[in-house]
Structures are given as structure tokens and as C-alpha cells.
Amino acid sequence: RTMLKEIYPGLRKVNCKIDYTVVNFDVEQGRIIIRENPKYLSLNEMYQVANSYPKGSKDFVNVFDIAVRMYPTDAVANLNAGAVALSQKDLDAAVKFMEKADHNTAEFINNTGVYNFLNGDINRAMAAFEQAAKLGNEAALATLKQLQQILSVKMK
């Protein structure tokens, strides 16, 4: 009884001190990690890796594919995957990803404009680009200006 009350309580207590250092993210290392073990990368790190490749390249597209598989419910991952699918004119995949994205962002509305344009609905595309441009999306504004120029030339 004495040992139980006086010795064992002291033995149960364990104090540990753990020191660790988190190294800064290196894009070159990220390129390796994303192929070997992508679960160790955050979504932001994956985005940095993707942007280290030429836009639209196979590796660029692959990183966004990995990101949406690792973070399937993340709105940003789905928005980016939807944009990549649209750039490849894969409308079915784009819709699947865009359904899971935040519908209230300028980027989503811009993607909707691209989707409508690729589907041949120019009026809905223009409306979406106008709305996205009003919300500050530069890509939508540039696309809108290009479409307006093309349409004004066709009308002449």
C-alpha cells in the first residue's frame, strides 16, 4: 500500500521537452515531394510548385490534379482544378470541380464565363465576365475587352 501511494504516483509523471525546426519551403524540394508523397505539402505549397512550371504544361496540370485529390472538399483546390479543366476544354470535369467551389468569388464567376463561352453561350459569358470584372478580376476584364473588340469587328 505504501508503494502505491508514495512511489508509483511519481513514476507515472513524465516530462518531455521536444525541440524541432521547421525548414522553409523550397519549391525544388516541393517538386520532388509532390511526386513522392504529396500529403506532406499544404495546398499553398502545391500552388507554389504548380506555378514553378510553365502554365498549361503537363506538370502544371498534374499538380492541380494532385491538389484536388489531396484536398477534395477545399473550395480553392476545386476552383483551380475547374480552371485547369476549362483550359483543356474538359467541360464535364470543369462542372464537377466548379460545383464544389465557392460560387461567390470573382474567380468562380470568371470560370463560369469561360464555361459559357466554351459552350457557345456568348451572352451569358459576357454577363459573367462583366460581373467578375466588377468584382475586380483582371482576367475577366481582359477577356471581356477582347470579346467586345471581336464582336464589334464582326458587327461592322
Stretches found by the model and what they are:
Residues 1-156:
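N-terminal targeting segments with Sec-dependent signals, encompassing both cleavable signal peptides
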